[in-house]
Amino acid sequence: MTNGADALCDTLLANDIDVCFANPGTSEMHFVAALDRKPAMRCILGLFEGVVTGAADGYARMAEKPAATLLHTGPGLANGLANMHLSLIHI
């Protein structure tokens, strides 16, 4: 039976998003488990949200396709917002 985390991974893969930069916490374990079940999805661990969002931005610029990010809600998202804002600037 497909759960929401598997459906999200399937949706990402169906849209050619096959890399996820992640700084997961305990509340995201269902999605982390789903990433592990999808061999086509590459998950890259980052130890700080700024690294995760910066790496996703750099990947998208070099590969010319988006990457997914997995951050904690609240403070994790706040730590990544600066890079998310900068990713909107085309260099």
Regions found by a protein language model. Give the residues of each.
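Thiamine diphosphate
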Residues: 1-76, 82
